[in-house]
Amino acid sequence: MPELTATPNLTALFGKAVLTGFTRRGTRLPDTVYEQPNVSVDRTHLARYDRVCEFRLTDELPVTYPHVLAFPLQVKLMTDPGFPFPLIGSVHLANRIIRIRPLRVDERLTLRVHVENLRDHARGRQFDMISEVLVAGEPVWTGVSTYLRRGGGSGAEKARERVEPPEPTAVWRVPGNIGRRYAEVSGDRNPIHLHPLAARLFGFPRAIAHGMWTKARCLAAFEGRLPEAYTVDVRFKLPVLLPARTGFAASTVDQGWGFELFDARTGRPHLAGTVTPGA
């Protein structure tokens, strides 16, 4: 297991992805596991993240924050020579977070990242990027990000049925600069989030919000109402074109919650998720 003594440099890795990534073709995922021990949380950075995602400023890490800590390890793995797909162009389909207990800002963390479960998708191939956080050798947080690499799929995806959105419990104005602001705190500087001109090169009429920002913003609305241990699943749907006016709806489902984010004017869905107690 390769052990990292410092956080990978995202600027260098994204440059590597641009220069070498588009020619990648492969059929197998690497079995590499990257580990970075003795990671401390920068309180200033945490406060900036909290403000961008609208979490309260506390000594407890937001449930989505460890994803930001592990993201450089994910990018390092996805830009390694043995990774079969280009980093640029990968689509974030879904994200699951399993929180075994809350994490505090003063705890020393070990980050661990690997990839698994390569499988077919109607539009190509999908795989799961697994991120783990351990404290004193004990797992306390797991994130599963499912990515799609388009091309070569069966094309047999079911047509989406038109579903009327629920009545919103809140309406949020999403500023046009949220992509740049989240990029600054997350390190995810994909050009589709930063500027309309760059987004148009990839087929979007305007810059779009990061999927993990939309998930974080939704979970910030639940602060103070969730148990210590829970699993939160999200499927990303249509992108949030910036600036935007979004509707948020939440309702109780069994012992947990269901929630949705959608365009407040058209009802077009952006995200659907569930929170289930326990881990």
Q: Which residues make up each language-model segment?
A:
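Hydrophobic beta-strand-centered segment that forms part of the acyl-chain substrate-binding groove
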Residues: 61-115, 125, 214-249, 256
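Hot-dog-fold acyl-thioester-processing enzymes
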Residues: 1-94, 154-225
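Hydrophobic residues on conserved beta-strands that form the core of alpha/beta folds
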Residues: 34-36, 142, 229-231
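HotDog/MaoC-like acyl-thioester-processing domains
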Residues: 1-29, 73-75, 93-174, 242, ...
